Amino acid sequence: MGDKMDMSLDDIIKLNRSQRPAGRGRGGGRGARGGSARGGAGGRIGGGRGGGGGGAAGGGGPMRSRPVLTRGGRNRPAPYSRPKQLPDKWQHDLFDSGFGTGAGMETGGKLLVSNLDFGVSDADIQELFAEFGTLKKAAVHYDRSGRSLGTADVHFERKADALKAMKQYNGVPLDGRPMNIQLVTSQIEAQRRPIQSQSRGGGITRPRGGAIGFSGANRRGGRGGNRGRGRGAGRNPKQQLSAEELDAQLDAYNARMDTS
């Protein structure tokens, strides 16, 4: 030690290099440390491969031991579960069977009645067509303000009853208007076009009270005519002046203008 204290730093470095063993390098030292220090943890996780590997490597550097992952004794839940038994045949849930035979489609016979009087109600239609068979629906079409459109739907449970009612009542007047009855043959709802009202003047209607009288247009026209005739008869007709009388009036007017 006393010799090294008197030596310079460069001489000490040269001496240390000359005394170092030839077979030992930096890698070997690290390998030994890696085998001893990291061998314990590697043995607990991966089966004790870290210590032996570090010593055998020598100058090759440390070798990291990787844990071996096993699934022993750990049951993981499946991401999804399949049904035990799948149906042999796929079937749409909106249809019962067959193509185009939906459960929501209507059956039976449906009539479209048009050219109805605006006073015909749902009860009148039901009472009129109920004698031919069981009705599913019988209703008059109304607009948003509650006025009748002059058309109605009559839906029978059986198509034969609808045909019988159409043959019996097609063209028959109801409250003075002949009913126009058509059989709706497609599932598409028939286009509802309100028929223009016929002229009420000059016709005789049958009120539901049983009395027969003129329509409102005739009554209004009659009152207007009476008032017109009364006012015309009370006035005196204008007297027509002759040419001589007109000349005399003109001369009198001119004379008054001259004097003024």
UniProtKB/Swiss-Prot annotation:
Residues 24-62 have a biased composition (Gly residues). Residues 109-186 form the RRM domain. GO terms for cellular component: cytoplasm; nuclear speck; nucleus. Residues 220-232 have a biased composition (Basic residues). Residues 189-199 have a biased composition (Polar residues). Residues 1-89, 189-260 are annotated as: Disordered. SUPFAM superfamilies: RNA-binding domain, RBD. This is THO complex subunit 4. The keyword Nucleus applies. Component of the transcription/export (TREX) complex; TREX seems to have a dynamic structure involving ATP-dependent remodeling. GO terms for biological process: mRNA processing; mRNA transport; RNA export from nucleus; RNA splicing. Belongs to the ALYREF family. Disulfide bonds: none annotated.
